[in-house]
Amino acid sequence: MNKPFSQACENNKVAILAALADSFSASKTVLEVGSGSGQHAVFFAPNMPWLSWQTSDILANHQGISQWLKEYPAGNLLHPIELDLNHPWPIEKIDAIYTANTLHIISWPLVQAFFSGVSQHLNQQGKCCVYGPFNYQGQYTSESNAGFDIWLKERDSQSAIRNIEAIMALAENVGLSLENDHAMPANNRLLVFQKLG
């Protein structure tokens, strides 16, 4: 069986790594929420050897993630745990959380559930990095993002590029503060939240 492959995971991974390495420099453990194909995990983990990188996703995606991990093993890269945002997370506390290209795919109630889970499981002063496209003041940042949003909504009416203001409000309501908003290539962003306290 061929491994799953996502071009979106290959795009910008070097730029994402640079931002993550800075944000996660003081962390020891990271949970990747929605590891998808597993491509980000096998690239990021060996390039941040001080981290224990825990992959996770719904059970249907575990086989593909495991195929990537088998082909590109790393001592600090852990096999996926089942994480469904509709249910409690199967972890205790963790230093850092990363998710990419997820918040515009999942429904808004699941976006809310994501931030609730982050707040519950992230250690004090821990970092949460969120990669993907966002709108600012209700406006698309590019024509390509506008077209992408139309495609998303045609595919699933609950999907959409999220407004940064709504994301920040969700985060603030659960004790997370936006520390950085990094511009990424191809009209994407990397948002860095820190748990207050």
Located regions from the model:
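Conserved Class I S-adenosyl-L-methionine
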Residues: 141-165
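A short, conserved alpha-helix within the catalytic core of class I
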Residues: 106-118
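A short acidic, Gly/Pro-enriched loop at the edge of an enzyme's catalytic core
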Residues: 89-97
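Core SAM-dependent methyltransferase catalytic element
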Residues: 176-197
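Conserved glycine-rich SAM-binding loop
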Residues: 36
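Conserved beta-strand signature within the Rossmann-like core of class I S-adenosyl-L-methionine
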Residues: 125-137
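Class I SAM-dependent methyltransferase SAM/SAH-binding core
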Residues: 31, 39-87
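Class I SAM-dependent methyltransferase Rossmann-like catalytic core
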Residues: 1-25
